[in-house]
């Protein structure tokens, strides 16, 4: 495809893990341990190709006990070697409160602003000319209403499937506007 569309260079991006502060993740780490590993991995990749962009894991979401401190610790160690920090957020309406549910796009906006402040704080502390940007790479309306046990070794089991409503679509639209 690259040749067909006459693209000179392919954008290369590497995620340096996923939700590493989450105990459910294989390879879960404490912030310092993860940040040192991510810093070294990012530097090694960029030695082979300096156009590679790397994404350090932010906290799994803003409700984690690690949120804020995780971002600060990771960026304090790896700020100048990474290009992005990841953000993840999923919302549900378990309470059936439409007004509060639709207002979650405002919470998403605050989440973004908080991570920007942390990035700017670390940049200032380090007197860095480099800017770490945001990679909001996981977000949606998602709830586990159909989170039934799946029989082991079954063929094409239904997993993590939900029925979404117009209300859910409205929040997704508001979240898209927030991202813009």
Regions found by a protein language model. Name each.
Residues 1-15, 20-24, 28-32, 44, ...:
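A conserved hydrophobic secondary-structure block that centers on an alpha-helix together
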Residues 30-178:
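Noncatalytic carbohydrate-binding groove/subsite architecture in carbohydrate-active enzymes
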